[in-house]
């Protein structure tokens, strides 16, 4: 047999977590046709000697819901070996929808996920109403595969209209309709349902998200849509009313989530897990409750991240420590070059540093109150603020922090931040891990990631485009945890590959991918693991309406293959677009 493609002589990590073998992988008609040696001839041969060969990576937690309609490449995920992205996370998205609510959903996504509303308004085609219509509208050739979950906020607005945002509980009739629409979406191929209950999630107008206070009855009623189906997952984000300081909130909220997950007929459920400075024991409480839920027969998993979850701060970014200072606000509308010129004036700097930041959160803004709390403690947060450098280091000690730099220079931390942000003509960035770095190391991250109920997630690919670029998680996991880490335990490479592939595929129910096995879909990575590296994030202006976003590239991806076609070659997109919408369920293609 003549194959379409043979990947020859690589170290094959099949995704099962077992030790690798050296051999060849042959591809025919978009499927893995053979694994072994001396497999014969092929139209194309990729020399993988010295490289690792893995299944294509899956990303469980993205927000490409809008971007998928105008960006066929789904960057930056494609730059990091991702061949299947699951979107529709945290309860936000764009379907189902009535025409009168288009702007409402844009403002929702702009606020919660920091995606420019102008880009969404120009880029979205809105040629859909139902969730099935939406899936049909986005089902066209892309570079990688993608799948969609139906999301709670648009669903609630579609059914309840203005009542969805007025603190009014859903009626029994409302709940029945939401259950019916969720079932229809799942039967049309949606891979799950997501909801969000986070205090830090606000619309662009500063309002709570529509489903943030949904009742137990509503969540249980929607979850019942899964009964009798053999596919579908549930996802939630919840900070357990941390911002409101209610000591009874944690157990009350977890009871609600447990009831939600338990009502779905045994379908898998995942919850975001992270370490929070203002509730340092919360993640352990979540682990304990999740273990107890598992003992009750609830299929509960915890989405974890391989590094600190934080923000990139810079004069080009959505957020930096000076946005609330009166002097900066007077120049904030200027182009970057003019702002930098103004800020280099010593008198301007002296005046600004003599001021106190005004509140940046509140009505009319999506910025959460946490931002003001942090800005009032700039000395504290500067202990967790770092320069990433050209070879980004996300696990730095306090000795490398801005606080220590300021001490060494005999200046205040705020003055040092000011100077750093003016470097590289105002294009320098600082990294501030809001979550997962309370102890200034990854001891908690390692414990979370290696918990038996953990599953890799939380990259937020496509979201927070002006402050975050965590779609690089797969590359980071392979570089830092499976090769470079010196500060503590590493993760074996075979296990790291499993975390990015079969573990996610099995969780979602993608039976055709996630492993290098004969008959599986030929979504494959060929990686120069010894030389794999992340580059520094950088800002580009390529969104609709001239919007900007952070991108982060990698070096070391010899090839990324989707459906048997090479879509990335030596870290560059080839222009081929074999990826399509992945549907599960009765009407799956």
Where are these predicted regions, by residue range?
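Active-site neighborhoods of metal-dependent hydrolases
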Residues: 134, 138, 142-143, 149-159, ...
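Histidine-rich, glycine-flanked metal-binding segment
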Residues: 1-5, 12-56, 537
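Short, glycine-/Ser/Thr-/acidic-enriched flexible segments
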Residues: 32, 39, 91-92, 153, ...
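C-terminal cap of metal-dependent C-N hydrolases
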Residues: 10, 370, 443, 447-454, ...
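Acidic, glycine-enriched loop/beta-strand segments at the rims
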Residues: 13-24, 430-439, 445, 492-495, ...
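Divalent-metal coordination cores built from histidine and acidic residues
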Residues: 70-192, 228-231
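Divalent metal-coordination and catalytic microenvironments
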Residues: 10, 30, 50, 61, ...
């Amino acid at each position: 047999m003549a194959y379409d493609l043979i990947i020859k002589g690589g170290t094959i990590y099949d995704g099962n977590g077992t030790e690798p073998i050296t051999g060849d992988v042959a591809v025919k008609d978009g499927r893995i046709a053979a694994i072994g040696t001396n497999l014969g001839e092929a139209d194309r041969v990729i020399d993988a000697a010295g490289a690792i060969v893995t299944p294509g990576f899956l990303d469980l937690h993205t927000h490409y819901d809008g971007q998928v309609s105008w960006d066929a490449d789904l960057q930056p995920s494609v730059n990091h070996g991702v061949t299947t992205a699951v979107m529709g996370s945290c309860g936000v998205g764009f379907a189902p929808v009535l025409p009168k609510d288009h702007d409402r959903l844009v403002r929702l996504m702009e606020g919660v996920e920091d995606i420019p509303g102008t880009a969404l308004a120009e880029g979205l085609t809105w040629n859909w109403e139902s969730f099935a219509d939406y899936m049909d509208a986005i089902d066209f050739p892309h570079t990688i595969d993608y799948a969609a979950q139906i999301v709670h906020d648009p669903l609630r607005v579609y059914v309840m209209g203005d009542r969805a945002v007025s603190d009014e509980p859903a009626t029994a009739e409302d709940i029945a309709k939401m259950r019916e629409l969720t079932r229809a979406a799942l039967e049309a191929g949606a891979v799950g349902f997501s909801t969000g209950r986070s205090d830090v999630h606000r619309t662009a107008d500063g309002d709570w998200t529509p489903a943030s206070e949904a009742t137990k009855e509503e969540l249980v009623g929607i979850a019942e849509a899964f009964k009798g189906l053999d596919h579908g997952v549930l996802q939630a984000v919840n900070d357990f009313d941390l911002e409101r300081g209610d000591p009874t909130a944690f157990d009350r909220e977890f009871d609600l989530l447990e009831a939600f997950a338990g009502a779905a007929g045994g379908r898998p459920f995942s919850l975001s897990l992270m370490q929070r400075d203002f509730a340092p024991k919360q993640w352990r409480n979540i682990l304990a409750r999740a273990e107890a839920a598992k003992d009750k027969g609830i299929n509960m998993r915890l989405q974890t991240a391989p590094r600190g979850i934080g923000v990139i701060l810079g004069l080009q970014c959505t957020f930096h420590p000076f946005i609330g200072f009166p002097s900066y606000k007077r120049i904030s509308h200027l182009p970057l070059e003019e702002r930098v010129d103004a800020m280099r004036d010593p008198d301007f700097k002296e005046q600004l540093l003599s001021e106190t930041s005004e509140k940046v959160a509140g009505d009319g803004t999506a910025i959460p109150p946490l931002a003001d709390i942090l800005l009032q403690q700039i000395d504290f947060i500067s202990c967790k603020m770092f320069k990433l450098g050209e070879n980004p280091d996300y696990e730095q000690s306090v000795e490398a922090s801005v606080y220590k730099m300021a001490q060494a220079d005999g200046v205040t931390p705020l003055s040092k931040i000011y100077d750093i942000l003016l470097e590289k003509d105002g294009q320098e960035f600082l990294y501030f891990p809001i979550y997962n770095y309370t102890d200034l190391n990854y001891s908690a991250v390692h414990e979370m990631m290696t918990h038996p109920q953990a599953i890799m997630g939380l990259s937020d690919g496509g979201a927070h485009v002006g402050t975050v670029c965590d779609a690089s998680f797969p590359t980071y996991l392979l570089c830092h945890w499976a090769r470079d880490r010196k500060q503590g335990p590493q993760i074996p490479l075979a296990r790291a590959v499993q975390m990015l592939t079969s573990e996610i595929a099995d969780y979602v129910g993608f039976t055709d991918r996630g492993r290098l096995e004969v008959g599986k879909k030929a979504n494959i990575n060929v990686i120069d693991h010894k030389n794999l590296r992340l580059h520094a994030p950088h800002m580009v202006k390529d969104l609709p309406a001239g919007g900007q976003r952070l991108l982060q590239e990698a070096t070391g991806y010899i090839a990324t293959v989707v459906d048997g076609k090479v879509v990335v070659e030596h870290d560059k997109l080839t222009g081929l677009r074999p990826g399509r919408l992945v549907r599960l369920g009765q009407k799956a293609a």
